Amino acid sequence: MPSRGCSCWLLSLALLCSLAAAKEQYHEFVIRETTVKRLCKSHNIMTVNGQFPGPTLEINEGDSLIINLINRGRYNMTLHWHGVRQMRTGWSDGPEYVTQCPVRPGQSYRYRFTVAAQEGTLWWHAHSSWLRATVYGALLIRPRDGTSYPFDVQPTRELAPILLGEWWDMNPVDVVRAATRTGAAPNISDALTVNAQPGDLYSCSSHDTAVFPVTSGETNLLRFINAALNTELFVSLAGHNMTVVAADASYTKPYTTSLLLLAPGQTTDVLVTFDQPPGRYYLAARAYASAQGVPFDNTTTTAIFDYGAANNASSAAIAMPTLPAYNDTTAATAFTTNLRGLRKAELPSRVDESLFFTVGVGLFNCTNATAQQCGGPNGTRFAASINNVSFVLPSSTSILQAHHHGAPGGVFTADFPANPPVQFDYTAQNVSRALWQPVAGTKVYKLKYGSAVQVVLQGTNIFAGENHPIHLHGYDFYILAEGLGNFDAGADTGKFNVEDPPMRNTVGVPVNGWAVIRFVADNPGVWLMHCHLDVHITWGLAMAFLVDDGVGELQSLEAPPPDLPLC
């Protein structure tokens, strides 16, 4: 049996080896206009380094990144590293006016952070206006050198990441500005995309199709990212099953399925064995549209998986998968409820903060306004809220800067409600019109460092109930349960999965239903929680947690960097 001194020496040696294995990467991300042609029309779009999608970042767990953002575009810009915990480095999280002021044209800012205790697929995207329509890319986090994936079958190789997106035949910034000006719903997208290509089912798009060469008999790792702005997506690969092994950079128990569901912001890693007759097979994606009577992009995007066989003539028919109906909530629920965490959850036994948040769309009444400003139903303006508070971004400084300097006055208030102001039948078919109008404000909810937090996310049917993908910055959380109708603590708490719940950073709150999440507030700073349908965050479906510093340096937010942009 080794002595205590020997054990300590071995532990120190292991720690030093671990630190030595970690690396630091430096990248320059230059924002600039680039001309691209889709659907027979050329557009000048915002890109990073002229690439669309943007550069793929590939690191190992424990590595650090320095990203020098140089803005040579014509819009303010910030970048968000979606799903990265940003432990104590909230200044690099990216949402404009929440953790930083935007990087203005002609300016630059260096994002600095370490990716620790996370493996799998994350991504990065613009967090200003609707610029993430074209400014996005993959962030791949592999196990440390010498460590294999925790899969029974190791992949022969990894394919290029599969980024699902949306394309507008106009400037997406103009789309959201028009909606904001008029109070109406924004124009829907003109196409869905795979790796920025619509696929050959669209008019004037026969050559705009992503192709993935594959080898017969191999098992490959495929990484899916839903980078679309406003569309949840069903995804299927003709003739092939997919075994889910990770979601949002958290490993899952293997789950074999022919269908994936990804909400905007979510990622899914799957293993696929290419064991079908040599040929070409479509990967297809189309909308899961849960809101009744709401327009959506009902097109289908495709990519081709090509075995490359000698007899695989280009004129041969390409196998097409069968996708569910657009509104198939049963199929959507079946996928999400089958996900389980790979290991037993490290779940806090106590709950210090028990919160109940209603999430949904509403309407602002118009008074003394012109018809041009009231383009919503019956002369209203569209709105959205959490607990009837429609979130408003500050403009004079960021929330985190105001908090750090101890000067919240005029920027935010720390009075976000723990419960909705009025209890009602949240999912009723006819909700009283008196409950449709939220209150606008910039409110945060304060959490003590280390507190165990449980949030019931309750969807409402105030105006067109639908599935809401809720993303929490700075944290992963356990999804304990989800269900339809109104959450009933007495009946539904017993349904909680406390053994192996999936861990994610974005949860789909079912249409006219609920989801329960739990996390420990161990990361000081200001952390946005919002719907990842950009139309909804534009309307105010967001709030922020303000997590106080703990004890000592390692439980406190780092000092702001010297190049932090000013408003």
Curated annotation (Swiss-Prot):
Catalytic activity, EC: 1.10.3.2
Protein's recorded name: Putative laccase-17
Note on how the cofactor is bound: Binds 4 Cu cations per monomer.
Cofactor(s) recorded in Swiss-Prot or TrEMBL: Cu cation
PROSITE patterns, alphabetized: MULTICOPPER_OXIDASE1, MULTICOPPER_OXIDASE2
Matches recorded under CDD domains: CuRO_1_LCC_plant, CuRO_2_LCC_plant, CuRO_3_LCC_plant
Organism in which the protein naturally occurs: Oryza sativa subsp. japonica (Rice)
GO biological process, one term: lignin catabolic process
Subcellular location(s) of the protein: Secreted, Extracellular space, Apoplast
Gene name for this UniProt entry: LAC17
Keyword Protein biosynthesis included in the entry's annotation: no
Residues at which Cu cation 1 binds: H80, H471
